[in-house]
Regions:
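Ordered alpha/beta subdomains of enzyme catalytic regions
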Residues: 2, 64-299, 326-327, 333, ...
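Long, intrinsically disordered low-complexity tandem-repeat segments
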Residues: 9-46
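Ala/Thr-enriched low-complexity intrinsically disordered regions
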Residues: 52, 56-59, 68
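Glycine-rich beta-to-alpha transition loops that act as phosphate-gripper elements at the mouths
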Residues: 235-237, 365-373, 392-394
């Protein structure tokens, strides 16, 4: 890694004009090598899909050997140096740590969120693959250091340290596509304090965005009740990255395809689309436009029927083309119409009747036009004859809740004896008080139904067994308790290692396999938790030991405040 970093610096100083291409030797993985190297991952076992880590080797491979299972051009989008994708105060704090005695202290940071977006009962984990790529490429190039030097706030000693910087810690995360809940650590970073501090902003940027869009997609797909949902939002997204990674997250959340061709190539996911009004308008008349399209794309013949008049012109002309195809022996596997304006419930029912009477009961009726989960649910309730939904703006921008709200907080710091000392953040708002210590998560399933009963956060040294009675209690109202006896429940640890001692030890599944895993995860939710309005909230409980640790810290800090107040008085 040091050799690669020096090569990068030398090339930058020589004025290499091909700055858009990644230059380090370790980054020149060809697509052929990637495909050959991932053959064992192409047949993803169930444990691979849920993110079970590979067996930890005695000597971890170099970061350049860590692989993902995305499309062949993944390097060009993910393999870029995003080290300066951070807030300035992360770097100023790093320099502060560097010049203080605890510069080498190992700490634990947790990334978590406080409330489900959209008023929902659950969220979906997204962005883990991009988090891995970010950490792998983490280093300060010569141009980065020159820029930081130009700010006039960083000393030469600190900049020299950054020149040789690389990540050496451990990172754990909930597997991508998992159902997640508030206040539990989605990502846990165990690393020297300067390293753990630096990665805060990028981790939140990556995880917040894709988790938000995956969650929105899951809600939209739930409203569609088994109909196919297509992600159509690229042109309305906040830039290329948001459009492309957002489409990736939408697929994970349940969408069957995206209109984003770059996303399709990068992540090997299905792409789909029909045609625009401009296609129809460019021909002398609507029928000629439809016929020309059907001649070129007989197996993907979805005709947009609302350019002029949906029921008087569009649907009749589409039927005429379908009849001619049938007469000429053209068997289309995928044909129908798309509605993009007007009263979608009324128009779809009228169009369905016209198509059925013409002998085309298998014709698809697709709809778009500012759809979201609430409108789809309403259209379903009205009996709309729509079986395919194109969802754009409201999905790709998460329009009604455009931020996920994830945070990154210090939870523990290692003492001289090697033990982690728990740390807690107080707040005037009870929900903002953090859970201290080095922690892990158990998911508790009701064995009879395999539905999620609760999530249990405990200290890392604790273990729980399905062979012993499990006591669950609400940390906000601890008198509310539930006992689960052996045979009534199953346990699963959620956090899996991504990096150990700075080396990647995890292979991310392909996006479509993550999607399949996510669909299974959603099946583990109670119907009352999945409903869109006023859902049942799954309990996120604390172990007795973690709860007592938290209360003791709160009490001790309250006593310190009281003593200080007495001194002032």
């Amino acid at each position: 890694m040091d050799k690669e970093r020096k090569n990068d610096s030398k090339e930058r100083e020589e004025g290499c004009k091909q700055s858009s291409k990644v230059r380090e030797e370790g980054y020149k993985q060809s697509s052929k090598e990637r495909e050959e190297g991932c053959k064992q991952s192409s047949k993803v076992r169930e444990e691979d899909v849920i993110g079970t880590p590979k067996e930890t080797p005695k000597a971890f491979p170099k970061q350049g050997k860590c692989r993902t299972n995305s499309g062949r051009k993944q390097d060009e989008m993910d393999r870029q140096n995003l080290t300066l994708l951070t807030d300035l105060y992360e770097l100023t704090m790093m320099q502060g740590y560097y010049r203080n005695a605890h510069r080498n202290a190992t700490v634990v940071f947790d990334a978590f969120f406080r409330n489900n977006p959209f008023g929902g009962g659950y969220s979906i984990m997204g962005g883990v693959e991009q988090l891995i790529e970010y950490i792998r490429e983490l280093h300060f190039g010569a141009e980065d250091i020159r820029y930081l030097s130009s700010l006039g706030i960083f000393g030469k000693d600190f900049l020299d340290y950054l020149h040789d910087f690389h990540f050496t810690g451990d990172i754990y995360a909930v597997p991508e596509g998992s159902v997640i809940f508030p206040r539990e650590p989605l990502v846990k970073v165990v690393a020297p304090i300067m390293e753990a501090q630096l990665v805060e902003t990028a981790i939140l940027n990556i995880i917040n965005h894709q988790s938000l869009i995956a969650t929105k997609a899951a809600r939209v797909c739930y409203a569609a009740k088994g109909d196919g949902v297509l992600e159509f939002g690229l042109r309305r997204a906040q830039g290329p990255d948001a459009g492309t990674y957002g489409a990736r997250a939408a697929i994970i959340g349940g969408c069957v395809a995206t209109s984003n061709v770059l996303c399709g190539e990068l992540f090997d996911v299905p792409v789909a689309g029909t045609h625009a009004h401009s296609w129809v308008m460019s021909f002398p008349d609507e029928y000629t436009a439809f016929k020309a399209y059907a001649d070129i794309y007989p197996d993907a013949c979805i005709l947009l029927v609302d350019t002029y008049d949906t029921l008087e012109s569009g649907v009749p002309n589409a039927i005429r083309v379908f009849q001619e195809m049938k007469k000429n022996g053209v068997k289309s596997r995928h044909f129908g119409i798309r509605l993009d304006s007007g009263d979608l419930a009324y128009l779809s029912k009228k169009a369905r009747k016209m198509l059925d009477e013409a002998g085309f009961p298998d014709a698809i009726i697709s709809a778009s036009n500012d759809l979201d989960e609430n409108l789809i649910l309403s259209l379903k309730a009205q009996g709309a004859a729509i079986t395919s939904w194109g969802v754009g703006t409201h999905l790709i921008t998460a329009k009604d809740n455009p931020s996920f709200g994830g945070v990154y907080k210090l939870a523990a710091i290692q003492g001289q004896d090697g033990k982690f000392l728990p740390k807690i953040k107080l707040s005037e708002n009870t929900e903002k008080i953090t859970n201290p210590g080095d922690k892990k998560i158990y998911r508790v399933y009701e064995k009879a139904t395999h539905k999620i009963k609760a999530d249990l956060i405990c200290l890392n040294e604790e273990t729980f067994s399905e062979d012993k009675t499990l006591l669950l209690f609400d940390p906000q109202e601890p008198w509310k308790k539930t006992k689960m006896h052996p045979g009534e429940f199953e346990l699963r640890e959620l956090l899996v290692p991504l990096f150990q001692k700075g080396a990647c030890c995890y292979t991310s599944p392909r996006v479509m396999d993550i999607r399949a895993y996510c669909n299974k995860e959603k099946e583990s939710l109670w119907e009352e938790t999945r409903r869109l309005v006023n859902p049942h909230q799954i309990y996120v409980d604390l172990s007795k030991k973690l709860y007592d640790t938290k209360i003791d810290l709160l009490s001790s800090l309250s006593q310190v405040d009281a003593d200080a107040e007495n001194i002032e008085n």
